[in-house]
């Protein structure tokens, strides 16, 4: 009986130890609060061969990331598509319309990643998904990131096909007018919140 009690007690200690370590490990990736004035989410499209840069002025991000805790890192960015700004009122109105983002029906674009690959001390790939205009596709997002104390800086870019997301219909399907590939860019600076 005493032997059985010792076995049960030992197993209980082991289980609680694993739970404690697991929880501590899962909480190790710090959360980051964005410095909005130093962060930017944008894109570069091509119209008749000329590059057209733009930014999204409103977005929210939930970022838990650390190079030494990639298995516990995750990113979710929600972008208000209505906030697009290409420095042209007429063009922005067109981009918001049903022909492109259809912001009335699809007010958010969402990037989410929970799997990360480290290529070098400061180079990574986020394996995630991008949702635009109600269409979700897998995407690999290469980026560089550095953590110094309670400061995070990251930047990266990736190309996506606008046609995969149904962006640009009717006359805008012509890739000689609007290029098929759009380069998504971002610069993020954040401060640790825990």
Cite the ranges covered by each PLM segment.
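Low-complexity, acidic/polar, glycine-enriched regions of mature
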Residues: 24-194
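Positively charged n-region of N-terminal signal peptides that target proteins for export
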Residues: 1-6
